[in-house]
Amino acid sequence: MNDNGKVVSMRPYPSPNSYVRLDEVIYWSQGLRVKGLLARPKVPGDYEGLLYLRGGLQSIGMVRPARIAQFAAQGFVVFAPYYRGNRGGEGKDEFAGEDRFDAVNGVEVLKQFIQKEKVHLFGFSRGGLMVLWTAILRNDIKSIVTWAGVSDATATYWERVDMRRGLKRIVGGNPNKVPERYENRTPLYEVAKINAPVLIIHGTEDQHVDIEHAYQLEKHLKGEGKTVETWFSYGLKHHFPPKLNRMTVQRL
């Protein structure tokens, strides 16, 4: 019996928005109990689903309740997996290794709380890898947004000196030693399997995820004849100023 995406338990979680209900969810993913945060508008409605895929690594870049409540307030049911090994979840964070299935199975969690069979993907930073793999491994995604998203795991290792120690430990070495493990985490070579339109949002002065990740993703998608749109913000870095961030979310 396949229990992937089956909810084990839920508990109320403090919400920063009086119009949005939050619950922490434990669900099955590849035999592991993984945690995530669910945000639902309190006003009843026929909402579409949004899978929010966080950035960072392990405890860095953890899901922020205010962020997913912001999307729920726009009229979505939002589910944000923490990924395995985080916040008491079983397994270990693998930086888009087997933990990509925590995102894939997160779609099944989301579908249990929406009436429309419409699920959209949103990924930030490392979440860019996760949204692309989810769209590659599923055929029921309606749209994809990758914001300041990673598209090349090898490039991330070389660009982020501060992450090298953690990545070597998680992946099992550097790209010179185990190049195939970084290539296997890089979705650029599999984008032919993506069937949903992709929106790429990126600041040209991003020092955490170089703009080249966006350029390469756009190039590979167009090379496969996929529908892709780009919003490049000149002069902006990894995190947009709050007002512009809100305006961008409202445009989505």
Regions found by a protein language model. Name each.
Residues 128-139:
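Short glycine-enriched nucleophile-adjacent loop
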Residues 45-47, 52-91, 154:
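Short substrate-entry loop that stabilizes the transition state in hydrolases
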Residues 94-114:
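Alpha/beta-hydrolase active-site loop
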Residues 154-190, 196:
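Mobile cap/lid helix-loop segments that gate and shape the active-site cleft of serine hydrolases
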Residues 215, 222-252:
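C-terminal catalytic histidine-bearing segment of alpha/beta-hydrolase fold enzymes
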Residues 114-125:
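Alpha/beta-hydrolase fold nucleophile elbow
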Residues 2-43:
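N-terminal cap/lid segment of alpha/beta-hydrolase-fold proteins
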Residues 194, 200-202, 206:
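Short beta-strand/loop motif that positions the catalytic acidic residue
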